[in-house]
């Protein structure tokens, strides 16, 4: 058998395995590390360091824990101040960079002029295309169909609206961001907040159980604090991946792959639901609320991809969220006194993308690819929060936008359209080393050489994971991330 035929057969075998959503015995054996306690292994759960083997999980236990939840920290308390480094951050005030601010304002002024020109040309061209549609309809049917209860008229109206929508979908550039409008102001404010390096960014991502979306299985958090990055060449980003212990054995498999044990940025923290809430609340109370006069000089923002859903999930499990500024329109109070809460901004990567390029292709994975951000194992909450934060930092960096031509909406539109075409024409890429390693892992008999000696297995995937660690309380889990 030729090597190409072997590779083809191996590829087909793994595609078949993936199609079965990790339900085949071969993939389960490969996916799970050795040494699992039996009760969790039967549920496809990952090995967790330090976890009592007899500890149980499941839908019933999750809902029981959820019904008894008590958020002990409330809206203000945080034990993160007990750690010297973090407590010292309260004494750092934001110092405006006059030269940088001038460059940002110059960029925003040019952006408004550019977008206004693009909007006028795009609208004029789209109007001509729509007039042509109307003309063809009148020639063919005598008139433009109005809304009617008559079935024939109703079907004609439906077809007409579909033709209009097709023209709008194919039109480039998509312009949802007219200068002077609320969306353009949101875009400009986002760029100003991030480019000036004065905003503490708190990115969140929540994964739920697809067979009961009231059950939160993972929470990912990634934090960029400019107070820690004043003198940094490489940005310091603090990433956390929380796995709800009661939901540990619950695996998604119908709509998305379950990658809860594939966190790339450290060790996953497995905590009881109540302690997950305490962990999140302590971070929010520290980063998103002001305690000192110096604190009030910084802006604060939650970051997410379609973030409203993640905020809703946090509230559902009992997390107290500060008052939010969804549209970035609430006035800033420069005279705010010590301890008084400022509105926390909401920065949404999906919203920014849709404003500039339209709603089509707005998934996180597609945006990461479009803006050249390496990524893997999406739908792990910790990974997604980290990627979303990086994406937002790029979208809000005026210099990055200039370098990649993000504001050339026509060129970006054709680039996005090209990706859609390639997706339709090209197969998904699955690394051959992963294909063969899965096949090797399923071999019941080891390979031997001509002398009967066992051959070492090769083509081991090189992605390294730190695994998961059980903690009884949130404070101990947080402390473990500082080492």
Curated annotation (Swiss-Prot):
Could you name the domain of life of the organism this protein comes from? Eukaryota
Q: Which additional comment does the entry carry?
A: Present with 125 molecules/cell in log phase SD medium.
MF terms from GO for this chain are:
nucleic acid binding
Which protein, by its recorded name, is this? Uncharacterized protein YDR514C
Which InterPro entries does this chain map to?
A: Gfd2/YDR514C-like, Gfd2/YDR514C-like_C, RNaseH-like_sf, RNaseH_sf
Where does the protein principally reside? nucleus
Entry's localization field: Nucleus; Mitochondrion
Q: The organism's lineage? A: Eukaryota, Fungi, Dikarya, Ascomycota, Saccharomycotina
- What is the disulfide pattern of this chain? none
- Keywords from the named record: Mitochondrion, Nucleus
Q: Which GO terms describe its cellular component?
A: mitochondrion; nucleus
Naturally occurring in which organism (per UniProt): Saccharomyces cerevisiae (strain ATCC 204508 / S288c) (Baker's yeast)
